């Protein structure tokens, strides 16, 4: 069964302000029983506290995050064993790459080189029961020499699975439901992130009256990240498709909440998912 949990990037400032244990408590209080760890340093102390908080509050860690390379050395190219062992300590069956380093996107050859590095790390994780995934943004749907960047990555990294982010799929010009079905059993994880168009707020119009048109123009031509059910995406169809293709885990993510408390945003997404009939996926 597919589970629906919370994505830690949404709570990155809360982890910093409140600490790991209290943040987990608040996530559990909303009703989530699953989380993906992101934007949180995987130091030994943090891993130990995450494990304890997961047990105490009944929120399973179903995915963690690791970069391809990192200055602190905790990366897939520098310490794949350490990345895998941290995931194992947390009971996490998946590790995901949020994005390749910017230099990797220079051309098809650099994209393939980064993908091959990820592919080389995948068996190290697999030996320890952990699956490596790659998370998309919109840029992975750009074409290089006629091929989509995402397809170049997948061809060069056959041992790496996908974490498909439906907001970025839509922003990249594709239909999320069709894209989920297209990649099918290559999809292990899904990010449930809605897509919102919003009129300029009062502050933007105050700036306009003061002679600064920038905020109004930005809003008129911009896109927002939205709570599930508060945007334009067909989230019911998206979740049903994730279940249909057998994706084990989905996570509610909102990169920015525009002044709304992050826990309130996650709670609103939770309520909408309940209203759509997905209580079992949230409580599993």
Residue ranges and their predicted role:
Residues 125-228, 232:
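Acidic/histidine-rich catalytic cores of soluble enzymes
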Residues 247-277:
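C-terminal/domain-terminus segments
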Residues 12-18, 34-47, 67-78, 102-106, ...:
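Acidic-and-aromatic substrate-binding clefts and catalytic sites of carbohydrate-active enzymes
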Residues 230-243:
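A short, acidic, amphipathic alpha-helical segment used as a generic capping/interface helix at domain edges
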Residues 1-93, 161, 271-284:
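N-terminal pre-domain/capping segments
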Residues 36, 63-65, 96, 133, ...:
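Conserved beta-strand positions in the central sheet of alpha/beta enzyme cores
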Residues 202-203, 253-254, 281-284:
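Short, flexible loop/turn segments with low-complexity composition
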Residues 25, 53, 57, 72-162, ...:
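Active-site acidic/histidine proton-transfer and metal-coordination neighborhood
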